[in-house]
């Protein structure tokens, strides 16, 4: 089974079962036993089609004699894969893109007798007319974001930031890793990774982070197995850096999976004190435990726990509480492209949940302690507005300025929204709150 078939199965799983593309693709790559080269191609094809679905449909309409809505969903998936290869992957011969697509149609569309012929005809037309296709002009078609999402982002983002975010959402993000400075240093790890053929460089503003390309499956690297690094977006790392954690502190990370913020906290505290890392799902708590063990961290205590539940014996017990709240995820579309297609109505109840979690977790902060609130979305209704309502109901807390790297403007508000494309990060919101003495 090749990369194209794996990518097709991932697209089908996402469409039919509501699976997330990254999870479905990872499982299918393992199931199909793809080597690193085919795994990379499968990922590029799956994410590329996800990122460009509306744009590919725009092209398809120019080549079909019938209506797009009349296509069988799997035929449409196969045509998307073929067109994406022809349009975006110039190293793949056109003949291979066409022929492999026809074979997929024969295998997966046996009940649609004309499917192979249709796929062949459409893609050969595409090859013949390549370079003269009409290009989309609307944001919805050009950047493959639903109209409703574009309208929401337009009213949520600062002026001039909408199109840069849409562009960033369709880029392939680099992999950023945090060096485990308790075991090694950036220079030594960089040299080791380069020796394995990995292209890497220091992150331009985040200390002890490396940016990787051509990395393949990181889990196969000896340095990964030895716990010398873990993957974390610089925005997520920055949120922990802004907490100003000190050695020996008692820290609660209430929505911790997969563990990146707890790991960053451990490095900040040099594996001293204690970090209780919670998640509501047992398998995710186990994931945190496995990561901490691999990295050699001793101060992390994984716990299966619901962040909306109070606990009397934790009242005022922590120097810092980290709340990385469940959110709409609109800041990480570049990593999970299918988020853009989710029903926005399902996100309207999130602010109430976020406020509830923040209120419950605030009880566990000691007088003078720190409460960090973060999300991976750019919507004010899940960010600034949640903080405003929390502070109105909890006058014993106040916002505190953020200490940021020099690349950022001076921050006095205690809140920072990162827009994808601005600082080479995911979209993210960070707020630092302190409890009065």
Q: Predicted segment positions?
A:
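S-adenosylmethionine
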Residues: 1-437
């Amino acid at each position: 089974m090749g990369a194209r078939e794996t990518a097709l199965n991932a697209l089908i799983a996402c469409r039919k079962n509501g699976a997330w593309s990254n999870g479905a693709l990872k499982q299918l790559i393992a199931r199909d036993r793809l080597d690193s080269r085919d795994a990379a191609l499968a990922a590029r094809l799956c994410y590329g089609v996800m990122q460009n679905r509306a744009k590919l449909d725009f092209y398809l309409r120019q080549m079909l004699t019938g209506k797009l809505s009349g296509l069988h969903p799997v035929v449409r998936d196969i045509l998307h894969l073929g067109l994406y290869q022809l349009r975006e992957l110039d190293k793949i011969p056109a003949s291979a893109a066409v022929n492999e697509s026809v074979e997929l149609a024969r295998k997966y569309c046996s009940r649609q007798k004309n499917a192979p012929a249709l796929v062949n005809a459409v893609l050969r037309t595409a090859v013949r007319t390549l370079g003269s296709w009409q290009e989309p002009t609307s944001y919805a078609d050009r950047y493959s974001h639903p109209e409703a999402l574009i309208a929401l982002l337009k009213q949520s983002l600062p002026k001039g930031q909408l199109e840069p975010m849409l562009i960033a959402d369709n880029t392939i993000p680099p992999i950023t890793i945090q060096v485990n400075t308790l075991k090694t240093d950036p220079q030594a790890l960089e040299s080791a990774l380069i020796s394995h053929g990995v292209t890497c460089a220091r992150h331009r503003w985040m200390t002890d982070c490396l940016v990787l390309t051509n990395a393949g499956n990181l889990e196969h690297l000896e340095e990964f197995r030895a716990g010398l690094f873990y993957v974390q977006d610089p925005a997520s790392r920055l949120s922990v850096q802004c907490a100003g954690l000190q050695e020996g502190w008692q820290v609660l990370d209430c929505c911790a999976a997969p563990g990146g913020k707890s790991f960053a906290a451990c490095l900040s505290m040099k594996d001293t004190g204690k970090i209780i890392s919670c998640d509501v799902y047992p398998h995710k708590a186990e994931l945190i435990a496995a990561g901490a063990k691999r990295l050699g961290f001793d101060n992390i205590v994984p716990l299966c726990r619901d962040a909306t539940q109070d606990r009397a014996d934790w009242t005022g017990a922590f120097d810092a509480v980290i709340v990385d709240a469940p959110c709409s995820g609109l800041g990480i579309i570049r990593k999970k492209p299918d988020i853009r297609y989710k029903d926005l109505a399902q996100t309207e109840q999130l602010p109430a949940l976020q406020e509830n979690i923040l209120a419950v977790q605030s009880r566990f902060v000691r007088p003078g302690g720190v409460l960090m609130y973060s999300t991976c979305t750019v919507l004010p209704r899940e960010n600034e507005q949640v903080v405003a309502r929390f502070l109105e109901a909890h006058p014993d807390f106040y916002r505190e300025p953020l200490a940021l790297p020099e690349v950022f403007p001076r921050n006095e508000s205690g809140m920072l929204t990162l827009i994808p494309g601005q600082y080479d990060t995911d979209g993210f919101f960070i707020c630092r709150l302190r409890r009065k003495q």
